[in-house]
């Protein structure tokens, strides 16, 4: 019998300021991977995390 996937889902968080900001410390876009419980959090995740390219804490939004 096949097992179900479960409620935990691996997602990718991407910096929102890296995409629009041209004056950055280094080129590139900051990405983090994490898990979320799709039963508790149905909408897209937004977390404030440190971005090494912007060199500050910025909002990271879920992309996958």
From Swiss-Prot:
- Tell me which GO cellular component terms the UniProt record holds: organellar chromatophore; plastid; ribonucleoprotein complex; ribosome
One MF term in GO for this entry?
A: structural constituent of ribosome
Annotated GO biological processes are: translation
State the InterPro entries in the record. Ribosomal_bL33, Ribosomal_bL33_CS, Ribosomal_bL33_sf, Ribosomal_zn-bd
Where does the protein end up? Plastid, Organellar chromatophore
What is the first-listed, main subcellular location in coarse terms? plastid
In its keyword annotation, does this UniProt entry include Ribonucleoprotein? yes
Which of UniProt's keywords are assigned here?
A: Organellar chromatophore, Plastid, Ribonucleoprotein, Ribosomal protein
Keyword Iron part of the UniProt annotation: no
Source organism superkingdom: Eukaryota
Q: Report the family membership.
A: Belongs to the bacterial ribosomal protein bL33 family.
User: How is this protein named in the record?
Assistant: Large ribosomal subunit protein bL33c
Task: Tell me the organism.
Answer: Paulinella chromatophora
